[in-house]
Regions:
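N-terminal active-site segment of His-dependent metallophosphoesterases
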Residues: 1-82
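Extended active-site neighborhood of metal-dependent phosphoesterases/phosphodiesterases
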Residues: 6-10, 80-175, 198-202, 251-273
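Short, solvent-exposed beta-strand-terminating loops
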Residues: 13-36, 105-106, 177-200
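Structural motif
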Residues: 18-20, 70, 146-148, 175-177, ...
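Acidic/histidine-rich helix-loop elements
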Residues: 22-53, 106-130, 186, 217
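Active-site glycine-centered loops adjacent to acidic/histidine catalytic or metal-binding residues
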Residues: 23, 73-74, 101-102, 179, ...
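The substrate-binding groove and active-site-proximal loops of carbohydrate-active enzymes
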Residues: 44-48, 73-77, 150-155, 214-219
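His/acidic metal-ligating clusters that form di-metal
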Residues: 57-68, 154-253
Length: 274
């Protein structure tokens, strides 16, 4: 496991530390979910061979530093009884605050259109594994409000926008946690240098012309999403965004104002807020 140390000034009432993880992608399955689910292991495990080891080491680091784990999604690669049991065992013994990714609700990885109806098939079972509301929640630590939002499907929803406005009303400095990074030219260029699409939220349509048709549909922002992104860009209480999804460590600046920090697939980012 790679460990990165980052210090972020935010106006905390006292310094504190969190461990930022993302994209662990546990790949447990057994015959309780049928052979099709078991077959996913051979396909998916080679992409995430160290997931179990990384999570265990992050857990030990959390205990050593007495620091909570703030996870920005894809802790599991797909929904299975074995994966959910592993997650529940971990969250029962560690302080974990979660912002979900798209894979938290993935049944067989890419077999169907991912939308609210698809997500809701497994939402209750996944939610039962975590102590916070995995669709939207807030947690205040030493005067800093960490707002977790589920944007795994490249969209914000109206209730999330209203929730965010309510959190702004608390008047505290805020750190947003979400799985999918928001569009930034630097991030876009990095992704498009080797991918057919950027896998970012809110990419301007003129920059999506060359996307594969299915990825264009998947990643096209709607009106609510664009409005909420503009709100985030302009709200001075929002100080940082913690993200994942792209599987590498990266730092950019959203809307030329908000530092956006991505933590990669086998990294534990130890962040001290001051």
């Amino acid at each position: 496991m790679n460990v990165i140390h980052t210090t972020l000034p935010v106006g905390a009432t006292a310094p504190f530390t969190i461990i930022h993880l993302s994209d662990t992608h546990l790949t447990y399955a057994d015959l309780r979910d049928g052979q099709r689910k078991v077959d996913l292991i051979d396909w998916r495990l080679p992409s995430f061979p160290n997931a179990e080891k990384v999570l265990a080491e992050a857990g030990e680091l959390s205990r050593e530093l007495n620091a909570p784990i703030f996870h920005t999604g894809d802790l599991i690669d797909y929904v299975s009884l074995a994966n959910l049991e592993a997650v529940k065992a971990f969250t029962d013994t560690h302080d974990v605050y979660m912002a979900t990714g798209n894979h938290e609700f993935s049944l067989y990885v890419g077999e169907a259109k991912e939308d609210a109806a698809y997500r809701n098939q497994s939402l209750p079972a996944v939610q039962a594994c975590f102590g916070n509301n995995i669709r939207m929640d807030s947690r205040v630590v030493n005067g800093v409000n960490f707002v977790a939002l589920d944007n795994g499907y490249y969209l914000f929803e109206p209730e999330q926008f209203e929730f965010l406005k309510g959190e702004v009303g608390k008047g505290l400095p805020m750190v947003l946690m979400m799985h999918t990074p928001l569009y930034d030219p630097k991030f876009y260029e990095r992704m498009m240098s080797y991918c057919p699409c950027a896998y970012l939220m809110g990419v301007p349509e003129e920059l999506m012309v060359g996307y594969p048709p299915d990825r264009y549909i998947q990643q096209k922002a709607d009106e609510v999403t664009l409005e909420m992104m503009e709100y985030i860009a302009k709200e001075p209480l929002i100080k940082y965004i913690l993200t994942g999804h792209q599987h590498f460590d990266f730092e950019s600046v959203y809307a030329e104002r908000v530092p956006q920090i991505e933590t990669g697939i086998e990294t534990a980012r130890v962040i001290e807020f001051v």
